[in-house]
């Protein structure tokens, strides 16, 4: 069975040159300016171009190659900047004093003021992407190597663009190929994750480890042999790692402990660099490779062994959920939007977890002491997680509107969730109200007691304690666990769990135990509140995407629509798309509090300088536990204390940050105005809550009604 079709679509630059060629309506050209917005909205909405599932699948497949090409170009640009406009070699010689910079502002109208002195005789903008630390970890010792990698990135980008064109225009896979889920799982697990990790582990062992070992010992980067010399010359490697002299003999004689000089299991951080032991990370990636190479043989393909995904899903029938997974496999295989939703949700959870690993287990040398980069990486990965979660909800709603077939989905898990949607939404709504009032109420109580001069009646570590006992138990367990589970390890996975390990590099704290107290308990419940509100908005958008009491035939109106026609007042801003819009606002709210919590907590309890005698002087002097228990403390000791430096930056090389700071707050305040106008959204939520009141026979006589759009805008502009 040949799985590709030859030359299915002509390569035509004339066609591509015509704006809107993908849509009959748009190809006619503009009649109003709305046309240009629709171009942007529909260019990648392949569902709207055609109903042919095979063609849609090919377009998505091809677009993935295009995306990879763009990523390679972007990466190449990063490496090129490191080669052409950076002080990487100076930083490599003295990473504790020189600040990383790979951007020089050209003098056009005076913005060269932004080029500050970053050390190493270099004027530029300090960068906080962590690339320098990553380059050192991968064994790059010169700017020439960065040039070569940048060129390699462009070559790979070209290959990706070619592959995208080839697999749509020259040899396009057939639908059966796209729907062969087991083969896809096997190939991605074994190929991408398994062989990818194996290749990276190989690079780490043969190139990164010897070079970093020499760098840590203080050898001048210019005197370190080039990467290929380590790969080709076994004696050179054996100088650093003696077991290399034995070659592969210990591997085949199963005498693997011989390799423990370069595949370690130490735990904790390297005291020279403040990063994870690179011998630990090489061991880790080798283990991951083995794991995924095995996983890549789990699913049944041409060979008769292993599990078929459909059978695996059907086998999960417990007593309560009898036919629970019936037809779920078919839905995932045939509906791209459902698969995107599940994948985006899983990847988002991973991204948010990764954000925490970047500071708790800093993977690269000298990353932990570069505080600005640590803040940036945490923020960056939290934002990615947030976008992906909202994207998961968006695609789940698109799936509900476009691909959901109620006839095939009877009484399975999906159907049961949808039938319980009123109970789910009204409970979530109650949880949000409870969390919001109680967590904010604790702060307001503290502000009031503080203002009345009654500190003994406040919730804090020195008055009424609300210790996060479960979190402390988890921390303690992780601090002690390696003693029994990994007796040979030198330390637990991270100093943050507790104990007395403080890692300092060059007089700066890299990482120390992070104590949790009443202040963390309070802000944690703000996190719980904002996240639950985000979930409420997004889930409501998904569960009511096809129908609601307000608009029973919503599925016919599509994923995004302004109102249900002119005759139905109060149905505006109620589409699934509008829920994504409102969900994004709350995702931003959630992340703001998370980043505030992280940056203040780290500056107060972890980061700082350390004296010769070993006395730690934290950046904000450990004020988090007492100050952050009141709203006033957050405003005065965090927001104002940290913002005043930015606001007073005009005339220094930091001035751009002051301007961006002002501008970002203006955008934020302006956007609040639009939040209050979701008329139909609120009406739909109210109907669900009224249902819950009717169930319990406590419904009010006066019928609850959402604010009109005019009223909502009045409230919005007043707040603004």
UniProtKB/Swiss-Prot annotation:
The keyword Thylakoid applies. Chlorophyll a binds at residues 673, 681. It is found in: Plastid, Chloroplast thylakoid membrane. Chlorophyll a' binds at residue 665. The keyword Lipid metabolism does not apply. Phylloquinone binds at residue 682. Its main location: plastid. Its EC number is 1.97.1.12. [4Fe-4S] cluster binds at residues 563, 572. GO terms for molecular function: 4 iron, 4 sulfur cluster binding; chlorophyll binding; metal ion binding; oxidoreductase activity. GO terms for biological process: photosynthesis. The chain crosses the membrane at residues 60-83, 146-169, 185-209, 281-299, 336-359, 375-401, 423-445, 521-539, 579-600, 654-676, 714-720. InterPro entries: PSI_PsaA (IPR006243), PSI_PsaA/B (IPR001280), PSI_PsaA/B_CS (IPR020586), PSI_PsaA/B_sf (IPR036408). It is a multi-pass membrane protein. PROSITE patterns: PHOTOSYSTEM_I_PSAAB. PsaA and PsaB bind P700, the primary electron donor of photosystem I (PSI), as well as the electron acceptors A0, A1 and FX. PSI is a plastocyanin-ferredoxin oxidoreductase, converting photonic excitation into a charge separation, which transfers an electron from the donor P700 chlorophyll pair to the spectroscopically characterized acceptors A0, A1, FX, FA and FB in turn. Oxidized P700 is reduced on the lumenal side of the thylakoid membrane by plastocyanin. The PsaA/B heterodimer binds the P700 chlorophyll special pair and subsequent electron acceptors. PSI consists of a core antenna complex that captures photons, and an electron transfer chain that converts photonic excitation into a charge separation. The eukaryotic PSI reaction center is composed of at least 11 subunits. Belongs to the PsaA/PsaB family. NCBIfam families: psaA. This is Photosystem I P700 chlorophyll a apoprotein A1. It comes from Marsilea botryocarpa (Water clover). The lineage of its organism: Eukaryota, Viridiplantae, Streptophyta, Embryophyta, Tracheophyta. The gene is psaA.
């Amino acid at each position: 069975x040949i799985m590709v079709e030859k030359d299915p679509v002509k390569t035509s630059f004339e066609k591509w040159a015509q704006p809107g060629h993908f849509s009959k309506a748009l190809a006619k050209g503009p009649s109003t300016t709305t046309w240009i917005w629709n171009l942007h909205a529909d260019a990648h909405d392949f569902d709207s171009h055609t109903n042919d599932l095979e063609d849609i699948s090919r377009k998505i497949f091809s677009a993935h190659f295009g995306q990879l090409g763009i990523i390679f170009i972007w990466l190449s640009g990063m490496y090129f900047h490191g080669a052409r406009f950076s002080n990487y070699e100076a930083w490599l010689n003295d990473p504790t004093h020189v600040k990383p910079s790979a951007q020089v502002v050209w003098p056009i109208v005076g913005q060269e003021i932004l080029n500050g002195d970053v050390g190493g005789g270099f004027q530029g903008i300090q960068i906080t992407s962590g690339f320098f630390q990553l380059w050192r970890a991968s064994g790059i010792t010169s700017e020439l190597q960065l040039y070569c990698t940048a060129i390699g990135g462009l070559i790979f980008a070209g290959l990706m663009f070619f592959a995208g064109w080839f697999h749509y225009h020259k040899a396009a896979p057939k639908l059966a190929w796209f729907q062969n889920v087991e083969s896809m799982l096997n190939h991605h697990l074994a190929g991408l994750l398994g062989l990818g990790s194996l290749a990276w582990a190989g690079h780490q062992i043969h190139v990164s480890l010897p070079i970093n070992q020499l760098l840590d010992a203080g050898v001048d980067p210019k005197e370190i042999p080039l990467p290929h010399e380590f790969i080709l010359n076994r004696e050179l490697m054996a100088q650093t790692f003696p077991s290399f002299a034995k070659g592969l003999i210990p591997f085949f004689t199963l005498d693997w402990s011989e390799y423990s000089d370069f595949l370690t299991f130490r735990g904790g951080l390297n005291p020279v660099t403040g990063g994870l032991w690179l011998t630990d990370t090489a061991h880790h990636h080798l283990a991951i490779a083995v794991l995924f190479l095995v996983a890549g043989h789990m699913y049944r393909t041409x060979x008769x062994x292993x599990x078929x995904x459909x059978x695996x899903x059907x086998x999960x029938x417990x007593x309560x959920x009898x036919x629970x997974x019936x037809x779920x496999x078919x839905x995932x295989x045939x509906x791209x939007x459902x698969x995107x939703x599940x994948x985006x949700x899983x990847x988002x959870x991973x991204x948010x977890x990764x954000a925490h690993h970047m500071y708790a287990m800093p993977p690269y040398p000298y990353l932990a002491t570069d505080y600005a980069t640590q803040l940036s990486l945490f923020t960056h990965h939290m934002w990615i997680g947030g976008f992906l979660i909202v994207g998961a909800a968006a695609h789940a709603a698109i799936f509900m509107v476009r691909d959901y077939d109620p006839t095939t989905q009877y009484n399975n898990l999906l159907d049961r969730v949808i039938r319980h949607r009123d109970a789910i939404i009204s409970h979530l709504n109650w949880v949000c109200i409870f969390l919001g009032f109680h967590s904010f109420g604790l702060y307001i109580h503290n502000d009031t007691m503080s203002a009345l001069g009654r500190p003994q009646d406040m919730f804090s570590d020195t008055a009424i304690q609300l210790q996060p006992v479960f979190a402390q138990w988890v921390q303690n367990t992780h601090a002690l666990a390696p003693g029994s589970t990994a007796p040979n390890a030198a330390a637990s996975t991270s100093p943050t769990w507790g104990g007395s390990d403080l890692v300092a590099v060059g007089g700066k704290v890299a990482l120390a135990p992070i104590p949790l107290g009443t202040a963390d308990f309070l802000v944690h419940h703000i996190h719980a509140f904002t996240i639950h509100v985000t979930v409420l908005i997004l889930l409501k958008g998904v569960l009511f995407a096809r129908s609601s009491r307000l608009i029973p035939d919503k599925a016919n109106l599509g994923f995004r629509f302004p109102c249900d026609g002119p005759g139905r007042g109060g149905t505006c801003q109620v589409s699934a798309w509008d829920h994504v819009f409102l969900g994004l606002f709350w995702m931003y709210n959630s992340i703001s509090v998370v980043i505030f919590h992280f940056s203040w907590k780290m500056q107060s309890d972890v980061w700082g300088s350390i004296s010769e005698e070993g006395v730690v002087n934290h950046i904000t002097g450990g004020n988090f536990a007492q100050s952050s228990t009141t709203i006033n403390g957050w405003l005065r000791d965090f927001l104002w204390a940290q913002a005043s430096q930015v606001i007073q930056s005009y005339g220094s090389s930091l001035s751009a940050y002051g301007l961006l700071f002002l501008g970002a707050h203006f955008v934020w305040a302006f956007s609040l105005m639009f939040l209050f106008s979701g008329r139909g959204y609120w009406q739909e939520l109210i109907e669900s809550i009224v249902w819950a009141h009717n169930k319990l026979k406590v419904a009010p006589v006066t019928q609850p009604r959402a604010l009109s759009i005019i009223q909502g805008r009045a409230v919005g502009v007043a707040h603004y």
